[in-house]
Amino acid sequence: MAGNQQLRVLHALDIARTQLYHFIAIVIAGMGFFTDAYDLFSISLVADLLGHVYYHGELPRNIHAAVTGIALCGTVPGQLVFGWLGDKMGRKRVYGITLLLMVVSSLASGLSFSKHEGMNIIAVLCFFRFWLGVSIGGDYPLSATIMSEYANKRTRGAFIAAVFAMQGFGNLAAGIIGMIVSAAFKHSSASKIDYAWRIILMFGAIPAALTYHWRMKMPETARYTALISKNAKKAAKDMSAVLNVNITPDDEVINELARQDEYGLFSFEFLHRHGLHLLGTTVCWFVLDVTFYSLNIFMKNIFTEVGLLPRLDSEYHHTLQRMITMTAVHTFISLCGALPGYFFTVAFVDRIGRVKIQLIGFTMMTVFMLCLAIPYDQWLRHKNKYGFAVMYGLTFFFANFGPNTTTFIIPAEIFPARLRSTCHGISGAVGKIGAIVGVFGFLYTEYHIRIFLFVLIGCNLVGFIFTLLLPESKGKSLEDLTGEIEEFQEEDEGSEVALSRPIHTVPL
C-alpha cells in the first residue's frame, strides 16, 4: 500500500500535460549540448587556422590530434565524476558547476596566450580544452536525468531528445559563425588571423552563459527529493510549483520506501536486474561514438580526398577560402541531414519507440556507408563529389534519427533513481572512450578511407546486436521500468493533470 500511495505523486508527474515549464527546461538543459556540438566542429576549423599561424601551413598530425581530441579525453572523467555526484549530492547542486566551468573554459580557450608562440600556446589551449571537456561530460548525465525526471511518461522521450537536439543547432551555429568570421577576415592582413580562431572558440560560451541564472533557479527533481533524499515535504512543494498541483506529503510513506531496494552499484542484485542493460547501453554508445565522432572530426580529410575541399597550402587567403568552403559544406550537411534527424527523433521517439529507432539507425547507417565504401573508387573516378556529400549527409541523418540520440535517452530511463545519473555517466564515459578511439585511432584515414569506412560499418553491426539487450521504455513510468515501486494500478491512464485546471490534492 505504501508503494501505491507514494506512486500517486509520481503518477501525477507521469500524466501531467505538457506545460511551458517543460520547454523552458529543454532550453536550459540544452545549452550545454549546444556548446558541445559547437566545439566539436569549430575546433576542426580552428585547427586549420592554428596551423597557418603557428606552423606556416598545416598542424603536425600528433598536434592536430591533441587539439581536436583533448576535450574528448576530458569528457570521460567529467561524466563519471559528475554522474556520481548527481546521485550523491543531487542533480541541481552540481548542475550549475558544469555550466560555469563550461563558460570559463570556453572563454579561456580563446584567450590562450604564452610568452613563446607555437607549441606553448597549443599546450595552454589543450589545458583549457581538457577542462572544457570535463564540463561537457558532466552535463550529459545531469541534463538527461533532470529532463527524464521532470517529464511525463507520454512525451518523455521527445523532451530528452529535444535537449539532445540542441547539438544540431550548435553544429549549425559553428558553420555559420565560421563562415562569418572567415569572410570578415578574408581581406585583412595575415597577422590578424590570430584573432579569428579566438573569436570562433569564445562564441560558444555565450548561449551557455545566458542560461546560467535560470539553471540555478531550477528546483531539484521531485523524484530525487522523494526517492533519494526522502524529503516528502520538499518534493511536494517543488512538484506543486512545477505542475500547479497541491500535494499533501506523508513522511511515513517515504521512510517505509527508504528501506526498499537499497542494492548498490555492481552488487549481485544490480547485475541481476540491470547488468545486461548497462552492458547494452555502454557498448552501443561506444561503437556509435567511434563512428559518429570520427566521421565528424575527419570530415575535412575525407572531403579533401574526394575533391570537395581544396588541399591546404601556406597561403593565407587559401586557408580562409578553405574554411569558407568547409563551413558551407558542413552547413549543408547539417541543414539537410543531421538537423532533420534530430527533429524526426523528437517527433517519433514516443510513437515508434527508442529501441526500434536505434535498430533502424544502425541498419541505415550501415547501408549508406556501404554505398560509400564499396564503390569508393567510382566516387573518385567520376568526381561525383556532390553525390558523396549526399550519402554522407544521409549517414548523419540516420545517426541522429537513430543511435546518436537514443543512446542518450535510454540510460536516463532504465536505471533506478539513486543510480540513474551514475549509470548514465558510465554509459556516456564508455561512449566517449569510443570517440577517443575514433579520433586517435584513425589519424591516417586519408590514405585508407575505404578501410576506415568498413571498420565503421563493423561498429554499426556490433551496435545493432547489443541494442537487442535493451528494454523498450516508451510510454512507461520510470518506476515501472526500474522496478523501484510496484506499478500503480489505477484505471485513469488517460487522465491528465493540466495547468489550466483548478488546484486539487493528490495524496502522498
UniProtKB/Swiss-Prot annotation:
This is Putative inorganic phosphate transporter 1-13. InterPro entries: MFS_dom (IPR020846), MFS_sugar_transport-like (IPR005828), MFS_trans_sf (IPR036259). It comes from Oryza sativa subsp. japonica (Rice). CDD domains: MFS_PhT. It comes from the Eukaryota. GO terms for biological process: phosphate ion transport. Although related to the sugar transporter family, it does not transport sugars. Belongs to the major facilitator superfamily. Phosphate:H(+) symporter (TC 2.A.1.9) family. Residues 1-22, 86-93, 139-159, 214-277, 350-354, 411-424, 472-508 are cytoplasmic. The chain crosses the membrane at residues 23-43, 65-85, 94-114, 118-138, 160-180, 193-213, 278-298, 329-349, 355-375, 390-410, 425-445, 451-471. The keyword Transmembrane applies.
